[in-house]
């Protein structure tokens, strides 16, 4: 399963992508987190449904200095990503 999440709020410049990468790797997920020009962070993660749901919990919480306002999600089929990167 593949999760696409657009995270809005104060999520850039606060270590959000590194936070996401750490939890994604711990959960055995593959994908990436990327800052977007509109101030959002896009997270693409692939793996089993339980791990994706657990990651979604952390996406909504964020690191201490982040202020997550919304997480818009979409699910689709996996595409075979490997590792978890930050862009």
Curated annotation (Swiss-Prot):
SUPFAM superfamilies: Acylphosphatase/BLUF domain-like. Its EC number is 3.6.1.7. GO terms for molecular function: acylphosphatase activity. It catalyses: an acyl phosphate + H2O = a carboxylate + phosphate + H(+). The active site is at 17, 35. Belongs to the acylphosphatase family. This is Acylphosphatase. The lineage of its organism: Bacteria, Thermotogati, Deinococcota, Deinococci, Deinococcales. The gene is acyP.
């Amino acid at each position: 399963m593949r999760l696409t999440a657009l995270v809005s709020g104060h999520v850039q410049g606060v270590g959000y992508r590194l936070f996401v990468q750490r939890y994604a790797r711990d959960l055995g997920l593959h994908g990436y987190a990327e800052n977007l020009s509109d101030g959002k962070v896009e997270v693409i993660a692939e793996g089993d449904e339980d791990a994706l749901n657990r990651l979604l919990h952390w996406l909504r919480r964020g690191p201490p200095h982040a202020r997550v306002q919304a997480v818009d999600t979409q699910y689709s089929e996996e595409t075979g990503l490997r590792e978890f990167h930050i862009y």
